[in-house]
Design a protein with these regions (language model features):
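Conserved alpha-helical scaffold segments that buttress catalytic/binding sites
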Residues: 2-241
Length: 241
């Protein structure tokens, strides 16, 4: 489907910015294809999608999804993927399809802000140029700033705790809902998971689109899939592709 057809990243940019200790050789990470399937089709895969270089110089690889999924819930486009920077591409995909206008608000449910500095400018001429920007010039921690710089996003509301999610009021205008499932990682200490799910479901129902990252480095992927299934379990038409 479009640019996401499955490919290897083999250079030192984007999420491939770690190098082996003994050789100047870039790591090799897999980017899954995007398919139209429902929640029940979420599967893990055996190829590495992220790596971390530890202080002793060793590389640890992390594994993600077999396929990225897209489907609709109540007419709202949903995208599920592993590394969070892919969200930027899907925002542009829906923007180019006139789902929303530039200057849209982003509601960001996550452990992290994902707003580390990124001085690179997006070439917005088409989705292909956006795709390669996402792969080569972004990583999981710095993909939001370029969207603010281009004007695609007008503002960002950061919901990084249970308290802020549960006390958040729906904005008046259009918004994108961006979710990192590591928000429900055990160390976050969520006390009422179902209540946070219910608030998230409401935000999904009103959104122009929803992007969901499983974040292999920050969350066990079996747990991520389980949480996504629980989140959508109470939503009608949850697997409409």
């Amino acid at each position: 489907m479009e640019n996401y057809r499955g490919l290897w990243l083999e250079w030192g940019n984007g999420n491939c910015f770690f190098w082996s200790q003994e050789e100047w050789k870039p790591v090799k990470l897999w980017v899954a294809p995007l398919v139209k399937k429902g929640i029940s089709e979420l599967e893990l895969w055996e190829e590495p999608v992220f790596c971390e270089r530890w202080t002793n110089g060793t590389l640890e690889y992390f594994y993600g999804l077999k396929e990225f999924l897209t489907f609709e819930v109540w007419g709202v486009p949903i995208y599920i993927f592993d590394n969070h920077n892919h969200a930027l591409y899907f925002w542009y995909k829906e923007y180019f399809q006139n789902c929303f206008a530039k200057g849209v608000k982003l509601i960001h449910i996550d452990q992290h802000s994902d707003m580390k500095p990124n001085d690179e400018k997006i070439d917005e001429k088409n989705l292909n140029s956006v795709f390669w920007f996402v792969q080569e010039q972004c990583n999981v921690g710095n993909f939001i700033i370029p969207a603010l710089g281009s004007g695609l996003l007008g503002s960002v509301d950061q919901l990084r705790s249970e308290y802020w999610l549960l006390h958040y009021d729906k904005p008046d205008g259009d918004y994108i809902l961006d979710i990192d499932m590591d928000f429900w990682e055990k160390m976050m200490g969520i006390e009422d998971k179902e209540w946070t799910f219910e608030q998230t479901r409401k935000l999904i129902s009103w959104a122009k689109m929803v992007t969901i990252a499983t974040s292999p480095f920050f969350l066990d992927q079996k747990e991520a899939i389980k949480l996504i299934q629980e989140l959508f379990d109470e939503m009608e038409d949850k697997s409409e592709a």
